């Protein structure tokens, strides 16, 4: 029995400490990596933010008539970091909007998004969601001849999602007229949109809704929804230039807003399209029995920045070049054989070259000629290391990372590790740019989270121990049950002893 109890205890503790990487929940390392990736995007305009999406009809609602199962899959997709959701919607016989191919109403589906937004509406976890709608024709109803029967989709969004969370065309017009937009370095022809930081924290919005075709916007007009002219929504039938092998191709792609590519992806090709500047819309067909296989596709697309199992700060191996160890600084590791790069954690005291970016251009790079520690590169803002008109920097989007790969391929380095402007020196697990003295924007939340993660296993152990003690207190000890019988045995034994002093 003791083995069973302690086995249960060990399982509980391990389940608290560990977690699956990308499905149905994020491991702690994956969560930290995604959060740092979001933070380096803070000054990027929201139309250029790389994200991963799904065709919700195929991924969550296909192969089941169980509404609860489908909505649980949607909740898991939200929790692991999927941000864009393509939804085919249609009218039922009563002209209610439903998810095409299911009996689930659009309002019920939006309620799942609303619950997620409410639970993640804090500095630590907030991120942008994009909803992409397409109204489909069915045999029971028609969008022609009965417009008075159509539901008010603006009212549906307000009731089930919340208008306060939505970024609308009128808000965009105001922000453009007020200058609340992000600069478009390197792509002057790109339309202006606000930065992710302004979107999430200044005006506290969480979602943008688009129609993907003009037929949908004509049938269901709404001041809360952007029309298809704002999108660059491509499918597998559209010829796409990928991979991007030169800066001219990179700049052409960067000028496009809201770049989405819907197709059936494999784990191997989804990263390539992500690095080409497109946000993939996963069109793979899943059902409740196979949905766990989406993990491999998500792993190769959600994180375009960090390598697998990074950021890993736990290795305390001494450096060959210094006796000091502080694994709190990031490098970009370039692999010549496949012309690709990932971020990894390195000892801040190691001597390495550093990455510089031209001021006012997101796609022009340089590498310092001299190697130095991370701290030395940031002394006096790195003066003397970067070329003129360049500053210490890092790739902020997947497309910028691709342009960096193209630049490094011309230098032909073999296994280079180059400092990028990213560190967690100030607060563990809070990765920030602007040098080692930069403060963590959510230091209080991180400290609280670290404290909770530290005491949770202990709390579980204590709870199980208390439970065992309570169980033992309910179970009566056998000698108490047979008290009278044992008393008679003892008295009989004492009476049988010989009296007097032995000779």
Curated annotation (Swiss-Prot):
Keyword Transmembrane helix applies: yes
InterPro entries according to UniProt: CTDL_fold, Telomere_Capping_Maintenance
Record GO cellular component, one term: membrane
Topology in the lipid bilayer: Single-pass type I membrane protein
Origin superkingdom: Eukaryota
Signal peptide start-end: 1-19
Sites where a glycan is attached: 43, 66, 96, 140, 152, 227, 252, 312, 320, 338, 389
Transmembrane segments: 451-471
Compartments it resides in: Membrane
Classification via Pfam families: TIM-barrel_MTC6 (PF25506)
Recorded family membership: Belongs to the MTC6 family.
Designated name of the protein: Maintenance of telomere capping protein 6
Underlying gene: MTC6
